[in-house]
Amino acid sequence: MTIYLTELDSTLYFPSPEEALTEPNGLLAIGGDLSPARLLTAYYNGIFPWFSPYQPILWWSPDPRGVLPVAQLHISRSLRKTLNKTSLRFTVNHAFMDVVTACAAPRRYSEDTWITSEFMQSYAVLHEMGQAHSVEVWDNDQLVGGLYGLSVGKLFCGESMFHRQTDASKLALVALCRHLSRYDAPLIDCQMQNSYLETMGVQEWPRAEFLRQLAQLREQSFPAECWQPQVLTL
């Protein structure tokens, strides 16, 4: 079967997410680059890059979309017990590139990573611009878990997470949700559903509904103190 995709050029143009393929679900465009400007344009329009090593850059907007309503975060009984007795510390924007680097490391189930050096360089710039943020989990001075993503107005677009201790990435997500709730941020974009995220309360929304929410939230903004480096109390 022949697949027709828009090939991106040097402009920042993206086709409408509604033009994405149904198979593979959400594939919208190919090519372009991972410059900070293009990444921002993509995320502000409900599009994200995802590709394997040695593939061209692929851009996606799946239907349905994986989203986590912050108020509906699910904390299992076992995770709640861990949370109640933990001595771990949680911070925002204390070690952004360390988190990105940890997320880019090979996983047990795969040696591949889509977090390329170009992607990491662009995210470093986005962090300096105040657009990209991280949550860190610390055991004393050791970074044992975390996540990072991009703020699009009052929508947080999660990119990746990691853990070096059991449940550390889940605890990072709990910390993020509680932090966002203090600033009335209602939604985290998780891109695509999976069994791990489903246990945390991630839902599948029709793309059209996600795009409606995105259109509203991208016009709002966090106060500056939201993303200042800080220690989080859970």
UniProtKB/Swiss-Prot annotation:
One Pfam family matching this protein: Leu_Phe_trans
Locations listed in the record: Cytoplasm
Domain of life: Bacteria
Gene Ontology molecular function terms on file: leucyl-tRNA--protein transferase activity
GO CC, alphabetical: cytoplasm
Keywords, comma-separated and alphabetical: Acyltransferase, Cytoplasm, Transferase
Catalytic activity: N-terminal L-lysyl-[protein] + L-leucyl-tRNA(Leu) = N-terminal L-leucyl-L-lysyl-[protein] + tRNA(Leu) + H(+); N-terminal L-arginyl-[protein] + L-leucyl-tRNA(Leu) = N-terminal L-leucyl-L-arginyl-[protein] + tRNA(Leu) + H(+); L-phenylalanyl-tRNA(Phe) + an N-terminal L-alpha-aminoacyl-[protein] = an N-terminal L-phenylalanyl-L-alpha-aminoacyl-[protein] + tRNA(Phe)
InterPro entries: Acyl_CoA_acyltransferase (IPR016181), Leu/Phe-tRNA_Trfase (IPR004616), Leu/Phe-tRNA_Trfase_C (IPR042203), Leu/Phe-tRNA_Trfase_N (IPR042221)
Known EC number: 2.3.2.6
One of the protein's GO biological processes: protein catabolic process
Family membership: Belongs to the L/F-transferase family.
Function: Functions in the N-end rule pathway of protein degradation where it conjugates Leu, Phe and, less efficiently, Met from aminoacyl-tRNAs to the N-termini of proteins containing an N-terminal arginine or lysine.
Protein name: Leucyl/phenylalanyl-tRNA--protein transferase
Gene name per UniProt: aat
